[in-house]
Amino acid sequence: MVKAVTVLNSSEGPHGIVYFAQEGDGPTTV
C-alpha cells in the first residue's frame, strides 16, 4: 500500500491538500 499526502502551495499560501492511497501494483497519476 502506498500513501502520500501532497500539499499544493500558491502565491496566496496553502491552496489545497491532495491525498491518495493505492493498494496493489497499479499506476498512480496525479
From Swiss-Prot:
Tissue-specific expression: Expressed in fruits, leaves and pollen grains.
Molecular function, one GO term: metal ion binding
Details of cofactor binding: Binds 1 copper ion per subunit. Binds 1 zinc ion per subunit.
The protein's Enzyme Commission number: 1.15.1.1
Regulation affecting activity: Inhibited by KCN and H(2)O(2).
Enzyme class (EC, first level): oxidoreductase
Entry keyword set: Allergen, Antioxidant, Copper, Cytoplasm, Endoplasmic reticulum, Metal-binding, Oxidoreductase, Zinc
Primary role: Destroys radicals which are normally produced within the cells and which are toxic to biological systems. Probably involved in the protection against oxidative stress during pollen development.
Protein name: Superoxide dismutase [Cu-Zn] 1
Organism: Olea europaea
